[in-house]
C-alpha cells in the first residue's frame, strides 16, 4: 500500500475546489459532447446508442418519463452504467489504498463536497421537483415516487463530482494505476452532463442550473430571488 507525503496532502484543497466548481457549474451543457459521453457509456456496457432527449431541468425529464412504459423506453440502465464504469473504476483505485489513507482522502475530499453538493444543491432541487410533480400528477404521484425509488434509475452529476474529486486525486497526485477507458468515460459523463435518466432505448439528459447563489459560507442563499434556477424556471 502507498503512503501520502505532506506535499501531496497539501494538494487536497486544490482538488476539492476543482471538483466543487465542476459540481456547481452553471455553464450550459455542450450537447454534442454530452451525446458522445452517453454513447460511450452505452458502448462500454454493451448496449446500442440510445435516443437522447435533452431536458432543461430534472422536472422536465421526470414529466416525460412518468407516462413511459418498458415497451416505450426499455429497462433502466443506471445500475449497469454505475456498476461497469463508476464502481469498477473505484474498486481498482481502492485496492491500492490502505484503509487509513482511503479514510483520510474521503474525509478531506469526498465528505466536504457531499455536504455541499448533495445535502444542499441536490436535495433542494430534488425536493422542489417532487413538490411540483405531486401537484401535477395528483393521485399518480405516489405510485411514480415508489417506482423511482425502487428502480433508482438516475446518475446524479453532483454525486459523481464528489467521487470525481478523490478519483482524480488518486490518479493525478498519487499516480495509482487505473483503467483509462473507464476513467475517460466517467470523467466525460460528469463534466458534460447534468442529471441522467438512462433507459435501454432512450436516455434523458438534464441541463445544469442557469443560476446558483451562495453566501460567504458557501450555503445556498439569495435575497429576493431564487438561489437555484433552471432554464424552464424551476427554482428554489
Language-model segment annotations:
Residues 1-236:
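Short, glycine-biased loop/turn motifs at secondary-structure junctions and
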Amino acid at each position: 500500500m502507498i503512503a501520502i507525503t505532506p506535499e501531496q496532502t497539501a494538494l487536497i484543497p486544490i482538488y476539492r475546489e476543482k471538483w466543487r466548481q465542476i459540481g456547481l457549474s452553471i455553464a450550459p451543457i455542450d450537447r454534442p459532447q454530452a451525446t458522445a459521453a452517453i454513447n460511450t457509456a452505452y458502448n462500454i456496457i454493451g448496449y446500442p446508442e440510445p435516443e437522447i432527449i435533452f431536458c432543461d431541468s430534472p422536472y422536465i425529464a421526470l414529466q416525460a418519463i412518468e407516462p413511459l412504459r418498458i415497451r416505450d423506453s426499455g429497462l433502466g440502465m443506471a445500475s449497469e452504467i454505475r456498476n461497469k464504469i463508476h464502481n469498477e473504476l473505484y474498486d481498482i483505485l481502492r485496492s491500492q489504498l490502505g484503509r487509513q489513507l482511503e479514510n483520510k482522502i474521503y474525509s478531506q475530499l469526498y465528505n466536504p463536497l457531499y455536504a455541499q453538493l448533495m445535502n444542499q444543491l441536490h436535495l433542494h432541487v430534488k425536493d422542489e421537483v417532487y413538490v411540483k410533480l405531486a401537484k401535477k400528477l395528483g393521485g399518480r404521484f405516489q405510485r411514480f415516487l415508489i417506482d423511482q425509488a425502487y428502480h433508482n434509475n438516475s446518475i446524479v452529476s453532483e454525486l459523481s463530482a464528489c467521487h470525481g474529486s478523490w478519483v482524480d486525486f488518486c490518479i493525478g497526485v498519487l499516480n495509482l494505476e487505473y483503467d483509462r477507458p473507464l476513467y475517460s468515460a466517467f470523467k466525460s459523463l460528469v463534466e458534460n452532463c447534468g442529471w441522467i435518466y438512462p433507459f435501454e432505448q432512450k436516455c434523458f439528459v438534464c441541463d445544469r442550473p442557469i443560476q446558483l447563489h451562495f453566501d460567504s459560507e458557501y450555503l445556498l442563499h439569495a435575497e429576493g430571488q431564487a438561489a437555484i434556477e433552471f432554464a424552464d424556471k424551476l427554482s428554489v
